[in-house]
């Protein structure tokens, strides 16, 4: 393997430490904070060079997944269940793929059996519009990317104002109704919307 720069070695060592401690690799943001890099694009650049030099592998079918290739010594130190790392989307930008680098804050491990395909991502909920469906502010919803939905499905949709929202979907005769699960809120009525995926699960950290 090619020799690493000091910064690349710091990043690789940090990834290994996190895998030892947690059983899964750190987010790009966490890597930047650990080694003193404020720019996520700079971190991505170092990760690309580590990959080219053969130290890590990033699976393009599983966005943001990082696999350290010299983990023989770590294998006996972690009891990690086999997991798929899905991107956590902090925002949705019109015109960009939902899992574009610009949208992704970190990644999150899920058991492989919960991800039927590679088109799964997580979205952090902001607000209380879905509380009566058991989805609360700060929760992560697990979303399967798809462009269609049945009436009653909870979906991630892009509205006509290019804003992403999580609501229950209903196609009425002359319009689309995005229904909040909060009796104090009114539905969103649209002539059209772009469906970005169906919510298939919720993850919440109990403090």
UniProtKB/Swiss-Prot annotation:
Q: Give the EC class as a word.
A: hydrolase
| Residue numbers annotated as active site | 129, 167
Give a GO molecular function annotation for the protein.
serine-type endopeptidase activity
Q: Which residues bear the site annotation Cleavage?
A: 94-95
EC annotation from Swiss-Prot or TrEMBL:
3.4.21.88
- The highest taxon in the source lineage is Bacteria
Entry keyword RNA-binding: no
- Annotated transmembrane regions: none
| Keywords annotated in UniProt | Autocatalytic cleavage, DNA damage, DNA repair, DNA replication, DNA-binding, Hydrolase, Repressor, SOS response, Transcription, Transcription regulation
Q: Does the keyword DNA repair apply?
A: yes
What SUPFAM superfamilies would the database entry show? Answer: LexA/Signal peptidase, Winged helix' DNA-binding domain
Gene3D superfamilies under this entry?
Umud Fragment, subunit A, Winged helix-like DNA-binding domain superfamily/Winged helix DNA-binding domain
- Enumerate the Gene Ontology biological process terms: DNA repair; DNA replication; negative regulation of DNA-templated transcription; proteolysis; SOS response
Which residues fall under the DNA-binding region feature? Answer: 28-48
Kindly state which reaction or reactions the protein catalyses.
Hydrolysis of Ala-|-Gly bond in repressor LexA
Job description of the protein: Represses a number of genes involved in the response to DNA damage (SOS response), including recA and lexA. In the presence of single-stranded DNA, RecA interacts with LexA causing an autocatalytic cleavage which disrupts the DNA-binding part of LexA, leading to derepression of the SOS regulon and eventually DNA repair.
The UniProt family comment states: Belongs to the peptidase S24 family.
Assembly and partners are described as:
Homodimer.
- The protein's name: LexA repressor
Species classification: Bacteria, Bacillati, Bacillota, Bacilli, Bacillales
Its gene name is lexA
